[in-house]
């Protein structure tokens, strides 16, 4: 039996400066999945990763966004 513990974190702040979201998930055999996205007036960034807790496999991506969406 594999138990999943999904968790979302939405700080919910927005002061005209930015916003961010985070997601984390793991199971009893140490597989994991996480991501975050953040945006602000000058652009933003994101990161996503998943893999095993033993360090054998890690797959992910990351990136930056300019204020004009590129």
From Swiss-Prot:
GO MF terms held by the record: structural constituent of cuticle
Q: Which branch of life, at top level?
A: Eukaryota
Question: Which keywords label this protein?
Answer: Cuticle
Name of the featured protein: Cuticle protein 16 isoform b
């Amino acid at each position: 039996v594999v138990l999943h513990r999904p968790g979302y974190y939405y700080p919910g702040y927005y002061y005209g400066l930015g916003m961010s979201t985070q997601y984390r998930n793991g199971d009893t055999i140490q597989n994991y999945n996480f991501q975050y996205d953040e945006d602000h007036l000058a652009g933003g960034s994101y990161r996503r990763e998943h893999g095993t807790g033993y360090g054998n496999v890690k797959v992910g991506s990351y990136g930056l966004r300019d204020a004009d969406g590129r």
